């Protein structure tokens, strides 16, 4: 549905926070979809022609305290990383401190001007999208093959030859099975981002675009071979 994952509440929201979340959401569109919260860790599987080519662990926008700087200052420090930019022109996106992030801080009992204790991690978003300041970690080589096969089957069932499959997995050490998949699919993205798999904050990264080009222009790929 091309949703933005605007506000996510792990615990039941107060009426005031719920109203604020709706206010923020309706500023983006004329309709809002409210979905059930699914606990676990989110992974993006990139599927091409029925095969999993990459798996990404996306970590929500966050800062870690040093006992000296405010949350606002920590965000500025993190945004100084040359890997971060705007409008999808860099591997990672700038972290904002807008209404959504401040609502998230309020839920945790913080304000942007609070100083976090050393080592204290605070999330600024519930959703782990790279486009909202999240971090990308390539876990293709370590993700159990059962989940890769399941994600590929989901994309194939929808007739999508290129697809991003988002799975929430509570415990990735427990293999998926037909009887118990041990995961929940929260999205099938038919226009998946590729650069985040190649230029990761951590991990080796996976070359995706060249395989897409080979698919679209097989005559060129054949000539090169």
Annotate the PLM regions.
Residues 1, 17, 62, 79-81, ...:
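Detector for Asparagine
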């Amino acid at each position: 549905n091309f949703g933005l994952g605007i506000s996510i509440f792990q615990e039941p929201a107060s009426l005031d926070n719920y109203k604020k979340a709706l206010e923020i959401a309706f500023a983006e569109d004329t309709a809002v979809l409210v979905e059930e919260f699914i606990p676990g860790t989110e992974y993006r599987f990139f599927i091409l022609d029925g095969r999993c080519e990459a798996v990404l662990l996306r970590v929500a926008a966050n800062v870690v305290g040093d006992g000296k700087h405010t949350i606002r200052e920590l965000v500025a420090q993190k945004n100084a990383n040359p890997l971060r930019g705007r409008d999808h022109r860099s591997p990672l996106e700038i972290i904002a401190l807008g209404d959504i992030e401040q609502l998230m801080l309020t839920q945790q009992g913080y304000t942007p001007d609070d100083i976090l204790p050393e080592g204290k991690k605070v999330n600024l978003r519930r959703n782990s999208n790279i486009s909202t300041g999240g971090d990308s970690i390539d876990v293709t080589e370590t993700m159990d093959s059962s989940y890769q096969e399941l994600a590929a089957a989901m994309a194939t069932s929808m007739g999508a030859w290129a697809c991003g499959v988002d799975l929430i997995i509570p415990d990735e050490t427990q293999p998926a099975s037909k009887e118990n998949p041990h995961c929940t699919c929260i999205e099938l993205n038919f226009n998946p981002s590729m650069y985040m798999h190649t230029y990761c904050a951590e991990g080796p990264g996976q070359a995706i675009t060249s395989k897409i080009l080979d698919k679209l222009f097989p005559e060129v790929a054949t000539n090169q071979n």
